[in-house]
Curated annotation (Swiss-Prot):
GO terms for cellular component: plasma membrane. Its EC number is 7.1.1.-. This is NADH-quinone oxidoreductase subunit H. NDH-1 shuttles electrons from NADH, via FMN and iron-sulfur (Fe-S) centers, to quinones in the respiratory chain. The immediate electron acceptor for the enzyme in this species is believed to be ubiquinone. Couples the redox reaction to proton translocation (for every two electrons transferred, four hydrogen ions are translocated across the cytoplasmic membrane), and thus conserves the redox energy in a proton gradient. This subunit may bind ubiquinone. The chain crosses the membrane at residues 25-45, 95-115, 128-148, 168-188, 204-224, 254-274, 287-307, 327-347. HAMAP family: NDH1_NuoH. Disulfide bonds: none annotated. Pfam families: NADHdh. The gene is nuoH.
């Protein structure tokens, strides 16, 4: 498969200042900082986007008091969180209590290192990209468990236990739903997976891997703890769950981390099933930059998360777990068997 260079050639006159390796490292660090900053900004903008979309969905105005047409509501919310008291309960395990939101934020941002936004824009071109994503997703479970246990609050602890069981369960289905794509492409590298789908929408993985896509969507919503699978923080049952004792910037890190994960899962759907930066048709659409198509597709899936929150009811915790093991697991296994059979037939 054709290799794509994501580090540009260094001009010869710059080699007199630093070595080529040093320039490459500086380029990657700068690119990573820009991408992570953009991701945080997009996640923050998604908050106000979600509030506007839910207001439209529910036939109301939404935020319209701060700035023209409510455009500065996000700034007001950020200032409010920043100036709130950063309180730590006396009975809490302070180290774990402080570590939990940092782990939640770090794992969400670090996972974006493997996302190829365009042929030349991406932090890391790793052959173990998908495995790295699952490693970060596994670490994110500890953030919720640390927050629930360190708070020494029964609602927090119940939320942490729910999160651990739900996330570990649905990460199994998340991984199995991707194995069909990996088997068809022959690579764990997201850039290779996107390149294999180039040439138009009829080459996208959504068609041969439709069952895998459905289970990935369900498992992605469950892993990000979004409605209707927001069991770890169910307000009516657990009073905000594992972050009930958090305030100020610690709560803000959990809050932003959740929306960063939504952007991450949306970007993964784009790369794995919808061709990444590939235009749907080559008839005039290719004049638009590849990053434009990536952002449009990602925004579509972010909107799907928002509309799911506004239209679906929250099931009971036992119903969520039963649905995973009794519906999602058989569907992913059937999809794997069909994919394996098709690969063997095509090889023969």
């Amino acid at each position: 498969m054709e290799s794509i260079r994501i580090i540009p050639e260094v001009p010869s006159f710059l080699n007199q200042v630093l070595s080529v390796d040093a320039w490459n490292i500086l380029f990657l660090v700068g690119q990573a900082l820009v991408i992570f900053l953009v991701v945080v900004i997009v996640a923050a903008l998604m908050i106000i986007y979600e509030r506007r979309m839910l207001a439209l969905w529910q036939d109301r105005y939404g935020p319209n008091r701060v700035g023209p047409w409510g455009s500065l509501q996000l700034v007001a919310d950020m200032l409010k969180i920043f100036f709130k008291e950063d309180w730590t309960p006396k009975f809490a395990d302070k180290f774990m209590f402080i570590l939990a939101p940092a782990v939640a934020m770090f794992t969400a941002l670090a996972s974006f290192a493997i996302i190829p936004v365009s042929p030349m824009l991406g932090v890391a071109d790793w052959n173990i990209g998908i495995l790295f994503f699952f490693a970060m997703a596994g670490m994110a479970v500890y953030a919720v468990m640390f927050g629930g246990w360190a708070s020494q609050n029964k609602y927090s602890l119940l939320g942490g236990l729910r999160s651990a069981a739900q996330t570990i369960s649905y990460e199994v289905f998340l991984g199995l739903s991707l194995m069909g794509v990996v088997a068809m492409t022959g690579s764990f590298n997201l850039r290779d997976i996107v390149v294999a789908q180039q040439g138009g929408f009829w080459h996208w993985n959504i068609f041969p891997q439709f069952l895998g896509f459905l289970t990935f969507v369900v498992a992605g919503v469950a892993v990000t703890h979004r409605h209707p699978f927001d069991q770890p923080e169910a307000e009516q049952e657990l009073a905000e769950g594992y972050h009930v004792e958090y305030s100020g910037m610690k709560f803000g890190m959990f809050f932003i981390g959740e929306y960063v994960n939504v952007v991450l899962i949306s970007a993964l759907m784009t790369c794995l099933f919808f061709g990444g930066w590939d235009a749907p048709l080559n008839l005039g659409f290719t004049i638009l930059p590849p990053a434009f198509w990536f952002m449009i597709k990602t925004l579509f899936f972010m909107t799907m998360f928002v509309l799911a929150r506004g239209s679906l009811m929250r099931p009971r915790y036992d119903q969520v777990m039963n649905f995973g093991w009794k519906v999602c697991l058989p569907v992913t296994l059937i999809n794997l068997m069909i994919t394996a059979a098709l690969i063997l037939i095509s090889a023969a």
